Amino acid sequence: MSNTEERCDLSSSRDCPERHEHLLQRVTARAAEIGGGITVSRLMPSRQRRMIGAWCFLDHAGPAEFEPGGGLAVGPHPHIGLQTFTWMIQGEALHRDSLGNVQVIRPGQVNLMTAGHGIAHTEESLPDERHAHAAQLWIALPYEQRDIAPAFDHHPDLPRWQEQGVTFTLLAGALAGRQAPCRLYSPLLGADLACHDASTLQLTLDPHFEYGLLPLEGGLEVGGEHFAVNELAYLGDGRDGLQLQLDPGARVLLLGGAPFGAEIFMWWNFVGHSKGEIARAQKAWEEGDARFGRLDALEGPRLSAPPIPWKIDAE
């Protein structure tokens, strides 16, 4: 679940309004196709909200049903300057990358791929799979770590507990005295909140974090406003607690993080701290450069990068 769009605009983290304490903002999704006929709801980046902490990309895929042999099919494509983060809710998918990793991700598991200097990978549904429901996110790497060696980690066992009528699964960071196993480079939080019956939930927050709440199923009410599936509730920093009302059968993705101080640029499947970093990565990918690892380990035709939409000599 990556960016396969042929027309890509350059995105800067400073393109949208500054965060404000106690802000409550509704961010609406747009449809994007990612391969294999799978359409996702893309929440970030958008003109309304570029980032939540270091979280800089958010797709909600599904719930989708398809014929066997269909589903997710994203060919070899590159990344730099980020970590990809996949939370699988329903269905199974196969990850392959240019480091030689081959890994099936199943419901309740997380795949975390650190691109750093450069990596390439593929994503596809298993042959007999008929369902897909997942959240795909990117995490921008800080300037000091933007060029680290690539890596891949699979996390099948995550902290899970029940509280206030809600089942919590901790995906990233720390919450309620628990710590997720994911290796991160910025202060972040990710959690899945699911309930059977309608629930009122009191959350303890870090006032130094900004937050987002995305209903993946059902809906929620916060600050007197109701948010449906694929409506992201963005909350500025400055809160030490929050009360939520969850609809019956709701599932909500909770994201948080310390505001990302540096400006980053996003274009196609690249994150850079300058446009020059992105332009160099695009050129290296089109030339089949060894920067992106063993491309012969990946099956299928490579995705071609769109032309750079700005003047390279103006860097």
Curated annotation (Swiss-Prot):
Keywords: Dioxygenase, Metal-binding, Oxidoreductase
SUPFAM superfamilies hit by this protein: RmlC-like cupins
First-tier enzyme category under EC: oxidoreductase
Listed EC numbers: 1.13.11.24
Cofactor note: Binds 1 divalent metal cation.
Classification via PANTHER family: PIRIN, PIRIN-RELATED
Listed name of the protein: Putative quercetin 2,3-dioxygenase PA1205
UniProt source species: Pseudomonas aeruginosa (strain ATCC 15692 / DSM 22644 / CIP 104116 / JCM 14847 / LMG 12228 / 1C / PRS 101 / PAO1)
Record lineage: Bacteria, Pseudomonadati, Pseudomonadota, Gammaproteobacteria, Pseudomonadales
